[in-house]
Curated annotation (Swiss-Prot):
One of its GO terms (cellular component) is extracellular region. This is Bacteriocin hiracin-JM79. It comes from Enterococcus hirae. The gene is hirJM79. Keywords: Antibiotic, Antimicrobial, Bacteriocin, Secreted, Signal. It is found in: Secreted. Residues 1-30 form the signal peptide. InterPro entries: Bacteriocin_IIa (IPR002633), Bacteriocin_IIa_CS (IPR023384), Bacteriocin_IIa_dom_sf (IPR023388). GO terms for biological process: defense response to Gram-positive bacterium; killing of cells of another organism. Its main location: secreted. Belongs to the bacteriocin class IIA/YGNGV family. PROSITE patterns: BACTERIOCIN_IIA (PS60030). It holds the Pfam family Bacteriocin_II.
Length: 74
């Protein structure tokens, strides 16, 4: 029984080492976050609209609350 378990552990270890060396081939580009869902790297800029929707909604609500029709006029 112990020999079977040891044999399986060795086989799985060798298989895991081989598969780990293959890699996924996914490249990750470092990007800078500028707020409101805007990201830029050396090549391009893009918007994460899922994040931007929430941020833009906050801006609209805060603007309405602070400067709505009830706000004093100058």
């Amino acid at each position: 029984m112990k020999k079977k378990v040891l044999k399986h552990c060795v086989i799985l270890g060798i298989l895991g080492t081989c598969l780990a060396g293959i890699g996924t081939g996914i490249k990750v580009d470092a990007a800078t976050y500028y707020g409101n869902g805007l990201y830029c790297n050396k090549e391009k800029c893009w918007v994460d609209w899922n994040q931007a929707k929430g941020e833009i909604g906050k801006i609209i609500v805060n603007g309405w609350v602070n400067h709505g029709p009830w706000a004093p006029r100058r």
